[in-house]
Amino acid sequence: MSSQNPVWTTVSTAPDMLGESPFWHPTEKMLYWIDIPGKKIHRASLDGMVTEGWDMPQEPGCIAPAKRGGLVIALRDGIYRAAYWQSELVKIASIDYDTTTQRFNDGKCDTAGRFWAGSMFEPRTERLAALYRLDARDTVEHKKPPKFDIVQKDAILANGLGWSPDNKTIYWADTVDQIIHAWDWDEATGSMSNKRVFQKFDAKPAGWTPENTMGVNYQGRPDGCAVDTQGNYYIAMYDGQRILKFAPSGQLLAAIPTPTRCTTMPCFGGEDMKTLFITTSSFMRPAEEMKAQPLAGHVFSMQVDVPGLPVNFYQE
């Protein structure tokens, strides 16, 4: 089930603390991603000729491109709109959680143009996180506020959001619970039904090390995801130094080794959508690990055989 010796290329010019939320912009031919604790949005061209950063006033949890141009950005205290790169940030939705203990984390747009963002409870002790849906379609012409709803509750650390190519299935993970759920998905209404377990992973017991597995098949913690055109689901396993590729049936197809231990999120890009990008983390990692993996926090890429789904754009 293991992928054979993938060849990874370093894309970024400097490491992030916690790289996340990558997407490939097909028009600009640029890769975007964020550094959450670094409070920054990055973008870069594949040839390395363009590498730019944009400082944020708060931690960005996730970003997505907008059809009218610019970005939609989930910051700690709400959802913001930027009309173009480094433009003014305009808040379009406020959040009702306690911003001292919660922030947005993983998120992206669906094919209808709604923006979905999951939150996390930073102490990781209570189920106060949720999945939010922002529907701003037709709001500009009709001068009305977007609809901002809670779709799912009772999570701790939201991650792994993705959709199947036929728009019939939605995936969402809770990193702390070591679980990925799937639901039936209605693109027209944005509704979820028929919740079921897609994958459940072994937790990391106290004292576990790569050398002393204690008989537990610990593979890391489920983080961000990407989906290819065949419906295969790629999940970054934080602390596991791998990406797991699952068929729509749930069958494990491959375990792809990654350059650093803490891979955070994959995405597809490039002209043919056969470049797999990954963001990684160096945040609060042990000194010995950082010494052994000096490229932790960088963005990497490798080539794959099956193209991925393109990024969905925010519509308003």
Regions found by a protein language model. Name each.
Residues 40-42, 78, 129-132, 179-181, ...:
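A short loop-to-beta-strand structural motif that recurs across blades of beta-propeller domains
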Residues 2-16, 44-48, 55, 93-96, ...:
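A short helix->beta-strand "capping" segment at the edge of beta-propeller domains
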Residues 68-69, 84-85, 132-142, 240, ...:
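Flexible "stalk/tail and boundary" regions
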Residues 14-28, 56-74, 98-114, 148-169, ...:
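Beta-rich, blade/repeat-based domains predominating
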Residues 269-316:
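Blade-level signature of beta-propeller repeat domains, shared across WD40, Kelch, NHL, RCC1
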Residues 89-151:
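Hydrophobic alpha-helical segments and helix pairs
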Residues 83-85, 136-141, 183-191, 304-309:
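Short loop/turn segments immediately following beta-strands, especially the blade-tip
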Residues 25-26, 31-36, 71-77, 115-125, ...:
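Conserved beta-strand positions in repeat-built beta-propeller and related beta-rich domains
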